[in-house]
A protein has these predicted regions:
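Short alpha-helical elements
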Residues: 2-196
Length: 196
């Protein structure tokens, strides 16, 4: 009897811990958003105006360009690939905390427009982390388009410029053949990616 009671207490404690950890993880999305927004504001000097937008004609949006970049980076840190899931489920809990939140369609359009701003912020953060390093190393990773068996039938990227078409290759570190592209990244000695 006491053994069954002890086991049931362990399971109830595990269930309570699991509930607390999932609530804590959900809370972290807004916390990460605020922290990433502060970092973006710190490194956006001379890139945006006082309201956090890239200077352009037209009405000033209430949800700033820096907030779009910060929300995009926050979703990346949480490994959220689906914008639908992010807006329909994850951000519903934080509507009170983020009052001027835009729709998913507007977010997608503005994220594409702010890609240059995001890239410039990434370069500034990388420069701050690495300093003025003079030595770099190149690392590469295969980006597989399709399986090797389907490579000859794959039409993706074959029209037009053949110098940019996917090709067969071998990855020595993974000891595998692949059909696709090879992504090269220029990294500093501390491991920060400078360009790709």
């Amino acid at each position: 009897m006491s053994k069954k009671l002890h086991i049931s207490l362990i399971f109830s404690n595990l269930a309570a811990i699991k509930t607390l950890s999932s609530n804590h993880r959900m809370y972290n999305l807004y916390t990460k958003f605020v922290k990433i927004l502060e970092i973006c504001k710190q490194f956006s000097e001379n890139l945006v105006n006082e309201s956090g937008n890239v200077p352009r004609r037209g009405p000033v949006p209430k949800f700033s360009d820096l907030e779009v970049v910060a929300l995009s980076l926050t979703a990346e840190t949480e490994s959220i690939d689906s914008e639908k899931w992010l807006f329909d489920y994850k951000l519903q809990e934080y509507k009170d905390c983020i009052p001027n939140l835009i729709s998913r369609r507007q977010f997608n359009d503005r994220r594409k427009k702010t890609a240059g701003l995001c890239e410039e912020l990434r370069k500034r953060v990388a420069m701050e982390m690495d300093g003025g390093e003079e030595q770099f190393f190149v690392d590469s990773k295969p980006i597989e388009v399709c399986r090797v068996a389907r490579g000859k039938r794959c039409k993706m990227g074959r029209t037009g410029d053949f110098s940019q078409a996917p090709d067969f290759g071998f990855c020595a570190s993974q000891n595998t053949y692949y059909f696709g592209y090879k992504l090269h990244a220029l990294c500093g000695l501390s491991g920060v990616i400078h360009s790709y």
